[in-house]
Amino acid sequence: MEFVVDKSRKTVVITAEFAAERDLVWKAYTEPELLDQWWAPKPFSSRTKAMDFREGGRRFYAMVSPEGQESWAVQKYTSITPKTNFKFLNAFADENENPQLPGSDWDLNFSEQNGKTTITTTIYNESRERMEMLMSMGFKEGTEAAYDSLKELLATLSQARGQSNG
């Protein structure tokens, strides 16, 4: 995983490669029952309360600590090009889905070559302070841990897919 922080542009760019076909990786990002299996870094878990994956739709979810403490967030989908790109505004929220602005704009690009999928995620922060707060909360380490869980999930799904095709 490559993780680049550009403070002058208030951006974080994350590039990662996964040993899975793009349609499977896309599903892991766009289907709540799969997304909840990897989005939160262990030992936290992700719990989606509502998700409508379409332009103008949203995902409302909580990161849940091992002690049961919930940290809520909302993602509002602004653009979707199936299996290649989607964008959303991400903001922390309270349990009633009231966003705590400023948020950040996420732009995710999916490409496949030789059965491997590369995801490039560009996160544009509305303020440098928000970006620095995310980094101080362990965003890089959390992303690495979540991607480790995603790799495990994709391996399991790829194996199951191979068995069902055989």
Predicted regions and their residues:
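Hydrophobic ligand-binding cavity/cleft-lining segments
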Residues: 1-45
